[in-house]
Curated annotation (Swiss-Prot):
Quaternary organization: Part of the 50S ribosomal subunit; part of the 5S rRNA/L5/L18/L25 subcomplex. Contacts the 5S rRNA and the P site tRNA. Forms a bridge to the 30S subunit in the 70S ribosome.
Keywords: Ribonucleoprotein, Ribosomal protein, RNA-binding, rRNA-binding, tRNA-binding
GO cellular component labels: ribonucleoprotein complex; ribosome
A Pfam cross-reference name: Ribosomal_L5
Protein name from the UniProt record: Large ribosomal subunit protein uL5
SUPFAM superfamilies recorded: RL5-like
Function noted in UniProt: This is one of the proteins that bind and probably mediate the attachment of the 5S RNA into the large ribosomal subunit, where it forms part of the central protuberance. In the 70S ribosome it contacts protein S13 of the 30S subunit (bridge B1b), connecting the 2 subunits; this bridge is implicated in subunit movement. Contacts the P site tRNA; the 5S rRNA and some of its associated proteins might help stabilize positioning of ribosome-bound tRNAs.
GO molecular function, a single term: structural constituent of ribosome
Organism phylogeny: Bacteria, Pseudomonadati, Thermodesulfobacteriota, Desulfovibrionia, Desulfovibrionales
Domain of life: Bacteria
GO BP term, example: translation
Family per similarity comment: Belongs to the universal ribosomal protein uL5 family.
Organism: Nitratidesulfovibrio vulgaris (strain DSM 19637 / Miyazaki F)
Record InterPro entries: Ribosomal_uL5, Ribosomal_uL5_bac-type, Ribosomal_uL5_C, Ribosomal_uL5_CS, Ribosomal_uL5_dom_sf, Ribosomal_uL5_N
The gene coding this protein: rplE
Length: 179
């Protein structure tokens, strides 16, 4: 059991159970999965850029990244159906908890002028999406070896029914939201 998962079971579950008056600990919302996505529009012309993104996302997540391909052809973007346009990884269980721990305690504090995450990334159903401008904040990547910094989306899917439940869950786990 990872450190963050232990915090969830020992501290977060009782707090949420008391706050929302759940009768069973199984009703308490939890984290289902974490999805990481890098979208590279320029990768359709540059194959080296795509390979680099896959390698870096694999290093960050600890799991092999999968190439995402275009569903439709768009002539104005010089895009054909099936061309690679990005890569993604879905983390569950142990790797998910390890990644969230690393994100909250190491990566986010390394962001320049970091004052917390705005809480407007919730989708109305308790899931949270966070955009990162530079993926070099993760300790697995050496800033000197990264040719061009890439942005990425991180989506945390929870079993919460509302944004209030989801925010309290992530807040109790240690997600640094703006006050």
């Amino acid at each position: 059991m990872t450190r963050l998962e232990q915090i969830y079971r020992e501290k977060v579950v009782p707090v949420l159970q008391k706050e929302f008056n759940y009768t069973s600990s199984m009703q308490v919302p939890g984290i289902e999965k974490v999805s990481l996505n890098i979208g590279l529009g320029a990768a359709s012309q540059n194959n080296k850029l795509m390979e680099e993104a896959i390698k870096e996302l694999t290093a960050i997540a600890g799991q092999k990244a999968v190439v995402t391909r275009a569903k439709k052809s768009i002539a104005s973007f010089k895009l054909r159906e099936g061309m690679p346009i990005g890569c993604r990884v879905t983390l569950r269980k142990e790797r998910m908890w390890d990644f969230l721990d690393k994100l909250m305690n190491f990566a986010l504090p390394r962001v320049r002028d970091f004052r917390g995450i705005p809480d407007r990334g919730f989708d109305g159903r308790g899931n949270f999406t966070l955009g990162i401008k530079e993926h070099t904040i993760f300790p697995e990547l050496e800033v000197d070896r990264v040719d061009n910094p890439k942005g990425m989306n991180i989506t945390i899917v929870t079993t919460a029914q509302t944004d209030k439940e989801g925010k309290l869950l992530l807040d109790q786990l240690g997600m640094p939201f703006k006050k």
